[in-house]
């Protein structure tokens, strides 16, 4: 196997589909598919499971991708050591993140990362879902809670808190509860329960075991906008609600804390673009650390 075959295979592994990889490489999809079939034949191993909606790596494919990424990392480190044009960080890094953090905090700051590394293409996927790092749905994921399984590298990004909020208009029209049990007489805004992809995201039960949402939205930013519009009382991230004068705190002595973690597959350890992106994430959060955690006011 030559490096060109390896480069093409890595593109497919990272894109998770032939079409996306072919577009990124600037070649025909049929040509790429033939090259992958020829690579499998030359190695005598099945590397890809081809599905209608993309490709999944087999166990042999995972092993090959890990080996190629280590070789790629060594090559990039050698280029950086000896200088020249090769020392510039380049390539594509895909960051998956919850929509609240991804849209409201990270997206407005990505220009700074791009200015720092002009050769780097940054893809942000800010959607409320679990990302499969082994299937290359993202290179880096910002997760709620530390993953317990998989060949993953994880480091804590920051704690964050959530509190109850309502709009000023809602408070004027309906009043506010004095205890959590008083929430039963109010319209509540929360997640679509069967779409909650991690137990740690079931915030509402942490505030009141009897919580029953009358308006359910599968997006943190969507819930924020609904609460601001007077839809009811909802659990909001304090860093999203901060500074919004149209919101009032409800039961301000009740606070729930969670943590964001930076996670990536161990096969990506040492890659310059991964180091650049994770370093930037930590730097951006540290610069505004005070906004993520609110102490109880009770």
Task: Give the label of every model feature segment.
Residues 90-150:
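Central regulatory/effector-binding core of bacterial HTH transcription factors
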Residues 28, 35-38, 109:
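Residues within the DNA-recognition helix of helix-turn-helix
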Residues 23, 41, 115:
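Alpha-helical residues within the helix-turn-helix
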Residues 52-55, 59-62, 73-96, 295:
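Short helix-loop hinge/linker segments at domain boundaries
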Residues 135, 147-260, 287-298:
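C-terminal regulatory
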Residues 40-57:
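A short LG(V/I)-centered, amphipathic sequence patch enriched
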Residues 39-40, 247:
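Conserved amphipathic alpha-helical core elements
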Residues 11-26:
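Short helix-boundary/capping micro-motifs
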């Amino acid at each position: 196997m030559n490096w060109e075959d390896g480069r093409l295979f890595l593109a497919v592994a990272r894109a998770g589909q032939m079409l996306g990889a072919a577009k990124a490489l600037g070649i025909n999809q049929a040509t790429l598919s033939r090259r992958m079939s020829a690579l499998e034949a030359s190695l005598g191993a099945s590397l890809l499971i081809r599905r209608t909606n993309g490709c999944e790596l087999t166990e042999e494919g995972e092993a090959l991708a890990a080996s190629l990424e280590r070789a790629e990392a060594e090559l990039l480190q050698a280029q950086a050591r000896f200088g020249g044009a090769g020392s510039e960080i380049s390539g594509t890094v895909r960051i998956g993140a919850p929509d609240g953090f991804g849209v409201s905090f990270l997206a407005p700051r990505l220009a700074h990362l791009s200015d720092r590394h002009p050769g780097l293409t940054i893809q942000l996927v800010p959607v409320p879902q679990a990302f499969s790092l082994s299937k290359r749905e993202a290179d880096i994921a910002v997760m709620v809670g530390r993953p317990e399984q998989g060949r993953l590298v994880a480091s804590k990004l920051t704690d964050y808190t959530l509190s109850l909020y309502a709009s000023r208009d809602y408070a004027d029209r309906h009043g506010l509860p004095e205890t959590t049990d008083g929430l039963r007489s109010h319209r509540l805004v929360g997640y679509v329960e069967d779409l909650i992809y991690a137990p740690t995201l079931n915030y509402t039960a942490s505030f009141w075991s009897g919580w029953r949402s009358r308006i359910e939205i599968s997006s943190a930013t969507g819930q924020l906008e609904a609460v601001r519009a007077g839809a009811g009382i909802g659990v909001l991230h304090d860093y999203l609600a901060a500074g919004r004068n149209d919101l009032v705190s409800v039961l301000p002595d009740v606070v729930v804390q969670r943590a964001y973690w930076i996670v990536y597959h161990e096969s990506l350890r040492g890659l310059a673009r991964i180091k650049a992106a994770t370093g930037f994430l930590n730097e951006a959060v540290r610069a505004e650390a005070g906004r993520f955690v609110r102490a109880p006011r009770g």
